[in-house]
Structure formats: C-alpha cells, structure tokens
C-alpha cells in the first residue's frame, strides 16, 4: 500500500527536496532505490541495493524501482551538477595504463552508427595505445557522412597503418589471448559496434558519459561512466593528459576530439563546464582549428536537399510528434 501511494505521487519528494534551504549553498538531491517482487525481505534488500546503485550510476537525483526484471525510473530531471574531480581522472588514467601495459593488443569500438564523439574518443584511445607501443585497431561498421571526412584523414597515410580501422565483420580474427576491448561513448552491450567482442575477450574497459541503464555492460575490469562529462571526447582528452606526459597530438587528431566535444555540447552551449573548456583549450594548444572543424561538419548540398525533402513531407501528430514518409534511400547515411 505504501509503495502504491508513492507511485501515485510519482515520487514528488525527489523534486520537493531541492527546495530545502537550511544554510546549504548547493541544491540538495535525493536518490532512492526500491526492491520488490521477491518472497523474502533479504532478497528485496539486495534488489533495492541494486536499484540504488543504478540510480547513482545514472547521476542520482531520481528514484529507481526494481521489480523482478522490470525497472522503473522516476525523476532525474534536474540540471546535472558537474563534478570537477581531477583525482578520479588520474586514477582511471593510471589504471588504463596499467592494463594496457600488461597486454599487447587493443580493439576499440564505440556504438553502432558512430557519431563524431564516438569516433573522436575511439581515436583518442588509439593514440594512447600506440604511445604505449601496443597493437591497436578501431572497429567500424557503417560510417556516417559526418564521420567520413575525419576518418579519411587517416586512411592511406604513411603515419598510420592500413589496419588502423577494421571492419566489425573481421574483428574476431584480431582477437588474441592478450586482447583488451575498450568501449567508448556507450555502456550498453547491444548498442556497441560489435557486441560479440565483449563475450570473446576477458579484458573489457568502458568509457562513457551516458547514464547507466539496466542492460549496461557488466564484468568490465575498468569502467569509467561519468554522466557529468559533456562527451566521451572530453573524458578521453582528460585521460590523454594523465596517461603519459609525452603524448603530442597531430592537428587533425586534435580536430576529431574537438569536434566530438563541440557536437555533443551544441557548440559549447549546453553541458559545458570548466572541464569542457579546459579539454578544448588543451586540444587548441595541439593544433585543433575551430574554423576547419566547422567546415568539416557542414552538410553538403545533397544532405540539405534530403533533409529539406523529409521536413517538407512531415506531419504533426497530436501536436507533439513529427513524422515523415520520405523514401529511405534518400536519407541513408544522412545525419538528421
């Protein structure tokens, strides 16, 4: 009965607690984990602990109810307060270096249909691995039109091996006993570029800035999921500075990381804190050029036409949903 009562109220307490002012400078937030559905108290307690871990892993300021295999989320609408924790970054960077030094081969992948944040952060990890003299490959499937201009700058170049980028269809053939799989910009197994790598390799590392979900990757030897970071590129840029002082980025490498931050922050207009600008400043010092990045991110005329065609044929449903009936062939590879 008590659970039904607070469910009907949609956990308004999570929002009400923010109005409490008793001399505190920062806004108070509340995280709640509730476990139910089991036959005994001890089991429900364990389920509640898992629900609390999930609530905190998603950034806090919310309630999570775990009822068997079903999970319900409430709250989590407040502006995320940035955690400027250099110590945490150093610890994660040191752990990453130790793991890489103990292994010989690195496979890096982001989410399926990768955007520029996924590409840039994967590139940053690749640079770290190569600095530590490790064999490294970035796993790719379909490449979007926004990523292609950046990717082309590394293909058929003397400075980079031909197998820097490998197809997800061939990724399994690169697995060795000492292979480390590093996942960036995603923490859900089924959304990765090649999920089977997670099952085939014992050593998995996850770096992501999205809130954890119920199907997050489990069993990772190192997991750094920071929902307060603006982007995966910001996180990786920070780690580059701590893994090795001798890492020097080429200008077009810095461009890719800068582009990832720029896109995920809408041109530094949202989720941009001190860490974001410090990472951007580091990349600018290594040659990232704002004008060059903006030109590379522009849509070409065919993309503009495809988007305009889709919008012109769209309809509003119940004043809230926009849908279009444009031919799929016109939109393949176009980032909307």
Model-derived regions, located:
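Catalytic-core segments of nucleotide cyclases and related cyclic-nucleotide turnover enzymes
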Residues: 3-14, 37-60
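A short glycine-enriched loop-to-beta-strand structural element that forms part of the catalytic core
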Residues: 23-49, 62-67
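Short catalytic/binding micro-motifs of nucleotide second-messenger systems
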Residues: 13-24
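C-di-GMP signaling machinery
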Residues: 42, 67-103
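Active-site cofactor/cluster-binding pocket
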Residues: 162-219
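Single conserved hydrophobic/aromatic residue that forms the stacking wall/gate
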Residues: 323-335
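Anionic-ligand anchoring segments at beta-strand to alpha-helix junctions in alpha/beta enzyme folds, i.e.
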Residues: 107-171
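A structured phosphate/pyrophosphate-recognition subdomain
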Residues: 90, 101-114, 121-134, 211-325
């Amino acid at each position: 009965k008590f659970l039904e009562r607070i469910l009907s109220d949609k956990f308004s307490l999570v929002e009400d607690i923010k109005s409490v002012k008793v001399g505190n400078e920062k806004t108070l937030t509340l995280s709640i984990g509730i476990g139910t559905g089991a036959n005994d108290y001890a089991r429900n307690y364990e389920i509640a602990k898992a629900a609390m871990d999930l609530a905190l892993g998603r950034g806090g300021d919310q309630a999570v109810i775990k009822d068997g295999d079903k999970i319900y989320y409430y709250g989590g609408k407040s502006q995320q307060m940035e955690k400027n924790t250099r110590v945490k970054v150093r610890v994660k960077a040191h752990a990453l270096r130790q793991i890489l030094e103990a292994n010989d081969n690195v496979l890096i992948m982001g989410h399926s249909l990768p955007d520029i944040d996924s590409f840039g952060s994967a590139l940053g990890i690749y640079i770290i691995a190569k600095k530590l003299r490790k064999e490294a490959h970035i796993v790719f499937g379909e490449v979007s039109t926004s990523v292609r201009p950046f990717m082309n700058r590394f293909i058929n170049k003397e400075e980079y091996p031909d197998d820097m980028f490998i197809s997800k269809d061939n990724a399994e053939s690169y697995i060795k006993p000492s292979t480390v799989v590093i996942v960036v910009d995603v923490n859900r197994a089924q959304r990765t570029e090649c999920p089977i790598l997670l099952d085939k390799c014992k050593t998995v590392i996850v770096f992501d800035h999205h809130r954890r979900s119920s199907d997050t990757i489990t069993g990772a030897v190192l997991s750094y999921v920071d929902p307060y970071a603006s982007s995966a590129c910001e996180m990786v840029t920070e780690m580059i500075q701590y893994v090795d002082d001798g890492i020097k980025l080429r200008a077009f490498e810095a461009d890719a990381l800068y582009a990832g931050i720029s896109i995920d922050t809408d041109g530094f207009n949202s989720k941009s804190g001190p860490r974001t600008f410090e990472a951007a400043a580091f990349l600018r010092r290594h040659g990232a050029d704002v004008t060059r990045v903006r030109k590379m991110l522009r849509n070409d005329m065919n993309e503009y036409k495809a988007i305009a065609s889709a919008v012109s044929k769209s309809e509003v449903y119940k004043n809230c949903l926009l849908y279009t009936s444009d031919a799929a062939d016109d939109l393949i590879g176009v980032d909307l």
